[in-house]
Swiss-Prot record:
Residues 50-59, 269-279 have a biased composition (Basic residues). GO terms for cellular component: large ribosomal subunit. This is Large ribosomal subunit protein uL2. It comes from the Bacteria. It comes from Paenarthrobacter aurescens (strain TC1). The keyword Ribonucleoprotein applies. GO terms for biological process: cytoplasmic translation.
Length: 279
């Protein structure tokens, strides 16, 4: 993937850039793998906003991605197409299995049209192949990692993401995550070899707010710029600091939203580096 920069023909174009989509081989998706996708606008079932800054955006169809691949062990598949997916930053690969089945997977780096991939404990260690962690050598870079055996890939699925297998001990494998955290994962869990493609995605300059609106992202407005009816930090004569510790529109303290006693925390070997006291 490359990035194409626009010339500054308008203020919105100045400094903006776009992916060149050079790796894309097909413009229309596989119809049998499409499903309707209904937007929520950030609202729950009672119509209340539960996630701010969401709404609008271009209409999309969901592409069914095979995050398990358990039922295709030992069956070769040819990479028929590399496609764009509007629902994720990574590209997706359309696989044609020798038994006639068609599936989508996350497209890893260095996977090209015409390549062959395989799943199962006896698969080779090459990009796109899916194996249990117990069958992957220490030091291998992987992505699309399961957290529970058979639960489907949960970690390292976005563009450029990868996890490194750093050790295996007993029934656990130790993985180094992009955040620096080292976590134990059951060796029966599966992962795909290689890192996710489209790594240049993070270098795209969107250029103008309108491009984010096309993606369904609405503006982020500071509470101190609002009226008292809209936010606890609103109001005041002239510019104010808000007058209290940062809170959300419902008055609940901002920050520190993660549970300190989550059940899976016992699998963390070394925590990620956070805040000012990184070490």
């Amino acid at each position: 993937m490359g990035i194409r920069k626009y010339k500054p023909t308008t203020p919105g174009r100045r400094g903006s850039s776009v992916a060149d989509f050079a790796e894309i081989t097909r413009s229309t998706p596989e119809k049998s793998l499409l499903r309707p996708l209904h937007k929520t606008g950030g609202r729950n079932n009672s119509g209340k906003i539960t996630t701010r800054h969401k709404g609008g955006g271009h209409k999309r169809q969901y592409r069914l991605i095979d995050f398990r691949r358990h039922d295709k062990d030992g069956i070769n598949a040819r990479v028929a197409e590399i496609e764009y997916d509007p629902n994720r930053t990574a590209r997706i690969a359309l696989l044609h299995y020798v038994d006639g089945t068609k599936r989508y997977i996350i497209a890893p780096n260095k996977l090209s049209q015409g390549d062959f991939v395989e799943a199962g404990p006896d698969a080779d260690i090459k990009p796109g192949n899916n194996l249990p962690l117990r069958n992957i050598p220490v030091g291998t870079v992987i992505h699309a990692v399961e957290l529970r055996p058979g639960g489907g890939a949960k970690m390292a699925r976005s563009a450029g993401a990868s996890v490194q297998l750093v050790a295996k001990e007993g029934r656990f494998a130790q993985l180094r995550l992009p955040s620096g955290e080292i976590r134990n994962v059951d060796v029966r869990c599966r992962a795909t070899v290689g890192e996710v493609g489209n790594a240049e995605q993070s270098n795209i300059n969107w250029g103008k707010a309108g491009r984010m609106r096309w993606k369904g992202v609405r503006p982020t407005v500071r509470g101190v710029a609002m009226n008292p009816v809209d936010h606890p930090h609103g109001g005041g004569e002239g510019k104010t600091s808000g007058g209290r510790h940062p809170v959300n529109p419902n008055g609940k303290p901002e920050g520190r939203t993660r549970r300190p006693n989550k059940e899976s925390d016992k699998l963390i070997v070394r925590r990620r580096r956070t805040g000012k006291n990184k070490r």
